[in-house]
Amino acid sequence: MTNAATTVSVNAVGKRFRNRVALDGVDLDIGRGVTGLLGPNGAGKTTLLKIVATTLAPDAGAVRVLGWDPAHKGERRQIRRALGYLPQETGAYSDFTAFDFVDYVAILKEITDRQRRRDDVRRVLTAVGLENRMHSKIRSLSGGMRRRVVLAQAMLGSPRLLILDEPTAGLDPVERLRFRETVSAVASTETVVLSTHLTEDVAAVCTDVVVLDRGHNRFTGPPDDLAAMADGHVWETEMSDPTATLSWLTGQGRYRNLGTPPDGAELVPPSLEDGYMLLTAPDSREVRS
């Protein structure tokens, strides 16, 4: 049994697909609140979430979810009853209404009492802002609304652990804001783990962040601590300089640089994105030295 404050415990977990190492000795503990898995494509985020959600078994290491061991069939079933899962690739039957689709998933989740099940379907659809569209056909909904329908099914039964894989992918700014508000409300009482490659998602809702890069856990801690890793390494200047290790346009006609400061550059406070980019840069060890 893990510590009562720990919802998910991952110890030396490894996973390989043919000749590609997806996870290499990953260790981390996740507690209540919102934990963001941040990393580039191919970092191992989806693989790790599938292992925690019990849809994929690790090749090495051990996992505990809510105190249960998913390696044992009986405990794996307990985990699945206690979690909600929004995979990266999702779909919903377009000829179903939003209500009927979520109700169908509730039946699959063995919520057998009809009145309790239908009350819960209404609750989760209202929670994601679809109270006025719950009887609309899914094919008539916008992409953002469809994503919210699938989020609603993950929230059925008030799960103790909610796993969201790239939940804001493809959403417009308004839908992304609404999604973040919903996640924050859920996380006030339960544990949410979400994967993303967008630092703004982490900055907006996450209490902790885990940076995965090429199958390795590069950082675990509060977002402010990740930003602080770039302290003293972030500069802004009016023009780009080839001596800068990384640079990008800030949108105000100025370039932001990580690494060697060009002439006339101004040292500025680091952001979460600065810390993340510095940590995952191919030559990050040289930059931080």
Regions found by a protein language model. Give the residues of each.
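Conserved structural motif at the start of ABC-family nucleotide-binding domains
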Residues: 8, 22-25, 80
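Conserved ABC ATPase "signature" region
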Residues: 103, 107-110, 115-133
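Conserved ABC transporter NBD signature motif
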Residues: 61-72, 78-79
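A short, proline-enriched helix->beta-strand linker immediately N-terminal to the Walker B motif
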Residues: 156-160
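Catalytic Walker B motif of ABC-type/P-loop ATPase nucleotide-binding domains
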Residues: 162-166, 171
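Conserved ABC ATPase signature
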Residues: 95, 137-144
